[in-house]
């Protein structure tokens, strides 16, 4: 019987889907739903959110380059949409940078984990 944690399995695709849904809720919540927090916490949330998207995307089998490109476009698009009347929040270059750092950290974490697992499998 195969492990439910194997790469490209149903569990990995489900985790990616949940991560995307959570990101939509976090990034596009109306201003009244965004809790007050100490300075910098929003950047940490962005970083962790995009790191999670990167790790879950790699686990689901999305290629590194494709995933990085899509996530950076998603980050930029989300910031642009936040500045519209549709969402009513402010666009932030700082949030975009935190998103990109999160993508890079997530991809790096996945590469380290996958490399270690390949080494122990031999």
Task: State where each predicted segment sits.
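Bulky hydrophobic segments
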Residues: 1-96, 100, 104-122
């Amino acid at each position: 019987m195969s492990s439910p944690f194997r790469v490209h399995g149903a569990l990995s695709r489900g985790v990616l889907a949940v991560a995307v849904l959570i990101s939509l809720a976090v990034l596009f919540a109306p201003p009244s739903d965004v809790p007050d927090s100490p300075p910098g916490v929003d950047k940490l949330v962005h970083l962790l959110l995009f790191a999670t998207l990167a790790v879950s995307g790699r686990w689901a089998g999305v290629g590194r380059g494709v995933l990085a490109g899509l996530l950076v476009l998603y980050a930029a698009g989300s910031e642009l949409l936040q500045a519209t009347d549709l969402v009513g929040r402010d666009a932030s270059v700082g949030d975009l940078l935190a998103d990109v750092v999160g993508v890079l950290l997530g991809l790096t974490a996945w590469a380290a984990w996958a490399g270690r697992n390949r080494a122990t499998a031999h």
